[in-house]
Amino acid sequence: MAGQRGACTMSDVVERSLEGPLALTTDKSSQKRGDLVEILTGEKVKFDDTRLSLILQNGLETLREENALTDVILCVDVQEFSCHRVVLAAASNYFRAMFCNDLKEKYEKRIIIKGVDAETMHTLLVYTYTSKALITKQNVQRVLEAANLFQFLQLVDACASFLTEALNPENCIGILRLADTHSLDSLKMQVQSYIIQNFVQILNSEEFLELPVDTLYHILRSDDLCVTEEAQVFETVMSWVRHKQSERLCLLPCVLENVRLPLLDPWYFVEMVEADPLIRQCPEVFPLLQEARMYHLSGNEIISERTKPRMHEFQSEVFMIIGGCTKDERFVAEVTCLDPLRRSRLEVAKLPLTEHELESENKKWVEFACVTLKNEVYISGGKETQHDVWKYNSSINKWIQIEYLNIGRWRHKMVVLGGKVYVLGGFDGLQRINNVETYDPFHNCWSEAAPLHVHVSSFAATSHKKKLYVIGGGPNGKLATDKTQCYDPSTNKWVLKSAMPVEAKCINAVSFQDHIYVVGGAMRALYAYSPLEDSWCLVTQLSHERASCGIAPCNNKLYITGGRDEKNEVIATVLCWDPEAQKLTEECVLPRGVSHHGSVTIRKSYTHIRRVVPGAVSV
């Protein structure tokens, strides 16, 4: 079984073997291409026809379709499938055991198959004879269960990979249950990891309350559990116990030991934990309460598994101000990380290639593009760094160079969609371009996607619900456009949507809640676009123009950084738009004005902190 799981499919072997021309040769380097011929002596040759396996496979499928030479009929529901015993036995250990041992099915012409429907059986038989199977959202569970039953292990793995890619907060518990039922350990581990990373979005689902105790235990004990405060973990445990209180109250002590009670706010611990009726009637948890009390009373001197903060409690959501240009046209190498909640600044690594002793050797990062994918920051292009692409790893605080762009550019944008990075449009030094490149992080390679409808630079771009949006920009050096271009990766096509209220370039956009917010250029306003309604609205007026400013969401608010006003003076203020209060306020003042910079949001380990005071001129 292990050997089957790791083996290549027949079609894989054929594809590789047919890559080169067919030739009769004694060159050993070519022995793996086409039809292989090795001269052993002057009188002997060894012939290896690598195409024969494909011919056999196609021939067997044709025989099945024509019902020729079949020797067994599989009866599923009311449908019958004529097959060849030898093919079934060769492909599946289940059928090998059935036909090669002294079982009654070995001698029967018609065999009734239970536990699978006819449509799924047809899918498995097509796979058996062709090594191909169509897996969809509608059939993946049935195909997985049947493949597991008949021991088509590679098909099981394919279904598991499909489910892993389809994970979301609504279906992950169901997929976890499926993995547990069929002992799919690898899939189970991946789903548990997904739940740990998306804990807050998942814990409110009804299915979460049905988790078995061992699974809940594994999730809650993880250091990587993604919560902002331990109170969320405590409340989850109590909700889970109350859901089936009569049978779960006895499990409270073992589950509660995974809650880091010492890290709770002392007021919350007294008012919400110690006062909870279920806690009070369960003496077995009292030692855990005592540990938390002593931790608070001793000045945090007690050390245990429950006094160690989770990884995400060391992190904070921050927005980064990356590079750019100052009032005297000096290029900024620093990356400023601001935490609005804690009013603090985090020091991070300077931009790459900017720390040479000679100033003339340093790269000048300006009019580049940046985006965040999986908490890593990607930057690309720029006037002096046209083909360069780097990513910032926040866990090690370093920039790492990755594969170059195929087409160098600046005044472009980067957007993340479907786990890939898109580089859109821009200026190549001669003209505005409509080229779109897509980066695959797994293979570290770029490929082309459908080009933009309109060649633009200095535009705004973002992704929203499985589509890309390119807004405004300059089709040439003098003009601006109001066009909204929308890309659907499922069709690889661009279409035009409702135009912006004004023509604008040197603008930026961000997807936030149900809208796309656009700011910058000469607009003196913050606009919002609704992809659902395909309509625009004015959000709020600005006191000045903010051409080439940055915008980023952070802690459920929007932050507008820097830019240039109508006098071409750089701006140092950071504005905050609060959607709940519908209010625009000044958050703080940067050490220096900056424009043409990047602005993104990440979660950053909370180390090397310096204070930022509202209205201060430096940090």
Swiss-Prot record:
One of its GO terms (biological process) is response to bacterium. Kelch repeats lie at residues 318-365, 376-419, 420-466, 468-514, 515-556, 558-604. It comes from Mus musculus. Keywords: Kelch repeat, Repeat. Gene3D superfamilies: 1.25.40.420, Kelch-type beta propeller, Potassium Channel Kv1.1, Chain A. PANTHER family: KELCH PROTEIN, KELCH-LIKE PROTEIN 6. It comes from the Eukaryota. This is Kelch-like protein 6. Induction: Up-regulated during germinal center formation. Expressed in embryonic blood vessel endothelial cells but not in the vasculature of adult organs. In adults, detected at high levels in hematopoietic and lymphoid organs. The gene is Klhl6. Disruption phenotype: Mice show impaired antigen-dependent germinal center formation and B-cell antigen receptor (BCR) signaling. The number of mature B-cells is reduced. PROSITE patterns: BTB.
